[in-house]
């Protein structure tokens, strides 16, 4: 059975958590394959709003097995305090349906301090880190001296921990960074490490491949967005992991031949949190209105998101590098109040060239979006229950995007609740 992959096509915050929750009944397994507590997947259902950071978004479906894969970096404090303990109110049986890879990297308290020190040292060149210790943890992983979840089962775990933290303290001292409060976080860290030992810790590559061989339906849930990918994003303003479909293979331990559908999620407009290039960003009242209507504030940091019009060259690029098979358009309702919409179809470079491809360096200021004006629907969508009941202007907007990208839009979200999701045809999901 194939593994379907769901990932963001922009700079994150596209609405992946909601879509996973909507599509989850079609799957036996939901597996996260990269990122960590820097991601925030928001689910709204039955009057509840829940933000998941590390736990897969299928956790609210009792018949679904959820896996935190080897590609994640795990913050055990946040895992328990912000997720597991808060989920107790929903009476979920996490002992039955949540599994954690032994190969997932551990975020140590000293990693968080390193993140703060590195970001402060960059001065005006800050990349907008969430300061959750993600980058330093991935750095230790790549340099082959990080700690992994499986290490907590080893009798020499404390020796490994102390050795690594001593190295971190040398770096922190070099940066003259005050880490006097780290001890308090360490106490919490070890408290939750003891709880983590009692969780379902598995050799996830065998776990997921056994599920494939048993013909189970599997959805790989990405975090952040393709334009934040460490290799193909707007470098250096990127995250530290592979946010692409290829990351599902390395972050779960599955062969490329097992990849099935690739669902690419995008907002009907664009947003970005933190620093970095954003060609269609709006600095006017229109941008403020989009932020207001979309409640565009980071689910992890609370920072206001930068807002702008839809960027087709960037979207086309993300579809190409991921081999997207189906497009899912989110937050169409945010644009309800606009009589006209702008869509970026090309970029004008500083030398006058007009292109529809992403330049090597998007961080230069000589890139101007070229827009096409489309008619807005300028009406409320709350009474729309099917694709056919959507206003013609929204259907035209959708059709224009489909024609430009050469891919079908099979889902349109018209509100935050799981019920406010219109699916053209469920047959596109693996049966």
From Swiss-Prot:
Matching InterPro entries? Adenylosuccin_syn_GTP-bd, Adenylosuccin_syn_Lys_AS, Adenylosuccinate_synth_dom1, Adenylosuccinate_synth_dom2, Adenylosuccinate_synth_dom3, Adenylosuccinate_synthetase, P-loop_NTPase
Q: In which pathway does it act?
A: Purine metabolism; AMP biosynthesis via de novo pathway; AMP from IMP: step 1/2
Q: Which reaction does it catalyse?
A: IMP + L-aspartate + GTP = N(6)-(1,2-dicarboxyethyl)-AMP + GDP + phosphate + 2 H(+)
Output the Gene Ontology terms for molecular function: adenylosuccinate synthase activity; GTP binding; magnesium ion binding
**Residues holding GTP:** 12-18, 40-42, 305, 331-333, 413-415
Subcellular localization is given as: Cytoplasm
Asked if the Swiss-Prot or TrEMBL record annotates the protein with the keyword Metal-binding, the reply is yes
SMART domains in the cross-refs: Adenylsucc_synt
Q: Name one GO biological process term.
A: IMP metabolic process
Q: Active-site residues?
A: 13, 41
Q: Where does Mg(2+) bind?
A: 13, 40
Which Pfam families does the protein's record reference? Adenylsucc_synt
Q: How is the cofactor bound?
A: Binds 1 Mg(2+) ion per subunit.
Q: Which residues bind substrate?
A: 299-305
Q: Where does IMP bind?
A: 13-16, 38-41, 130, 144, 224, 239, 303
| The keyword Cytoplasm appears for this protein | yes
Q: Which Gene3D superfamilies match?
A: Adenylosuccinate Synthetase, subunit A, domain 1, Adenylosuccinate Synthetase, subunit A, domain 2, Adenylosuccinate Synthetase, subunit A, domain 3
Domain of life of the organism in this record? Bacteria
**Subunit structure and binding partners:** Homodimer.
> What is the name listed in the Swiss-Prot or TrEMBL entry for this protein?
Adenylosuccinate synthetase
> What is the primary gene name for this protein?
purA
């Amino acid at each position: 059975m194939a593994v379907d992959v769901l990932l963001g096509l922009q700079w994150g915050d596209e609405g992946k958590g909601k879509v996973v929750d909507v599509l989850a009944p079609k799957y036996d397994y939901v597996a996260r394959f990269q990122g960590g507590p820097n991601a925030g997947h928001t689910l709204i259902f039955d009057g509840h709003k829940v933000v998941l950071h590390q736990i897969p978004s299928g956790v609210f479906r009792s018949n679904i097995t959820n896996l935190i894969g080897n590609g994640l970096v795990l913050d055990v404090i946040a895992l328990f305090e912000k997720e597991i303990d808060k989920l107790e109110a929903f009476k979920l049986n996490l002992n039955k349906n949540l599994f954690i890879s032994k190969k997932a990297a551990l975020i140590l308290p000293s990693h968080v301090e390193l993140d703060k020190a590195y970001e402060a040292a960059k001065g005006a060149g800050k990349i907008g880190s969430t300061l959750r210790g993600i980058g330093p943890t991935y750095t230790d992983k790549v340099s082959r001296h990080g700690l992994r979840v499986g290490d907590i089962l080893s009798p020499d775990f404390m020796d490994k921990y102390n050795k690594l933290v001593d190295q971190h303290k040398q770096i922190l001292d070099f940066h003259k960074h005050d880490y006097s409060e780290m001890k308090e976080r360490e106490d919490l860290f070890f408290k939750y490490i003891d709880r983590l030992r009692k969780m379902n810790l598995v050799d996830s590559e065998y776990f997921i491949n056994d599920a494939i061989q048993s013909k189970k339906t599997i959805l790989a849930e990405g975090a952040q967005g393709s334009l934040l990918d460490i290799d193909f994003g707007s470098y250096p303003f990127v995250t530290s992991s592979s946010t692409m479909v290829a990351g599902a293979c390395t972050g779960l331990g599955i062969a490329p031949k097992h990849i099935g559908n690739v669902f690419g999620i995008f907002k009907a407009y664009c947003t970005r949190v933190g620093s970095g290039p954003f060609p269609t960003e709006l600095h006017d009242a229109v941008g403020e209105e989009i932020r207001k209507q979309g409640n565009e504030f980071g689910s992890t940091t609370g920072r206001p998101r930068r807002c702008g019009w839809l960027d087709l060259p960037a979207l086309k690029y993300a579809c190409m590098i991921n081999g997207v098979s189906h497009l899912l358009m989110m937050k169409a309702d945010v644009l309800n109040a606009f009589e006209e919409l702008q869509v970026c179809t090309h970029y004008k470079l500083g030398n006058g060239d007009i292109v529809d491809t992403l330049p090597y360096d998007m961080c230069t200021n000589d890139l101007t979006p070229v827009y096409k004006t489309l008619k807005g629907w300028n009406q409320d969508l709350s009474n729309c229950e099917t694709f056919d009941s959507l206003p013609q202007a929204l259907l035209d907007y959708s059709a224009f995007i489909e024609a430009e990208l050469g891919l079908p839009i099979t889902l349109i979200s018209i509100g935050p609740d799981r019920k406010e999701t219109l699916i053209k045809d469920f047959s596109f999901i693996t049966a």
